[in-house]
């Protein structure tokens, strides 16, 4: 299994203490106040709710996308399944980015290349599938929608796919190309867990042409998304007041975090990453102060930090960073 953020229990076991600050993920730390599901949401088999899909279409600014949107148990479910829907192919994955993409395309017999963002344009010419994380996790790198659609046109002309992972796209809606996902060969992944702070819900969406969604749905099987998850997501996707207030708060907090970090830091309102020269030492320094950050050891060698929740947590983070810089 690949390494991810979280795993706070392991940190506590290793370093001791209980008053930890978990900044190791890019998940909104002040998530949506989930309502209690109705009793029958627990009792009945969870058939897909058309109202949830309509709410998602409205939220993503694509009201005509209804036949082209499939709820799934988190974007991870789609990431694991999509490579099984193609014969062995030449696959280029943006790098560094969310490692599960490369892992699963490689695992299912495809010829994999990990391609820096600056080289993606050239990679499209001799690839059957191109996977782009936009905005990128962990670096925050972005690709303009017009460029993505141009790449899709090249790939689709020869039966290829463009897979765009927009899991962190809620804070940058202008980057989304989900509204175009009725086009054959374009697949867009959206997450409810990140912006809404509902990672435990395990709910996301795949936007794609109807025939491909039918294949994906068949592969994932019936009752892929629980009834309680559908009810909570329906409320969250329709709560415009909460969404607007959260966008403003995340923008403010993201700028505050960025101001604390080195000049080379980049990211999104939910997290920032930088190519720390001594990432293991930094990670250890923070852990000794009961602050859990994300250490990247390989292609994205560096550190990613998410947002603190409370002012006291901000103060602890600032103090720990000041000690590191003075050391």
Q: Where are the language model's segments positioned?
A:
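N-terminal "arm"/small-domain region of PLP-dependent enzymes with the aminotransferase-like
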Residues: 1-58
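Short glycine-rich anion-binding loops that position phosphate/pyrophosphate groups of nucleotides
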Residues: 26-32, 134-139, 169, 194
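Conserved core of the PLP fold type I
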Residues: 41-156, 163, 168-187, 233
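PLP-dependent enzyme catalytic core of the Aspartate aminotransferase-like
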Residues: 144-146, 288, 298-327
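A general structural detector for well-ordered alpha-helical segments in enzyme core domains, enriched
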Residues: 147-151, 177, 257, 282, ...
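PLP-dependent aminotransferase class I/II
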Residues: 185-265
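Conserved PLP-binding catalytic core of the aspartate aminotransferase-like
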Residues: 260-289, 295-298, 307, 311
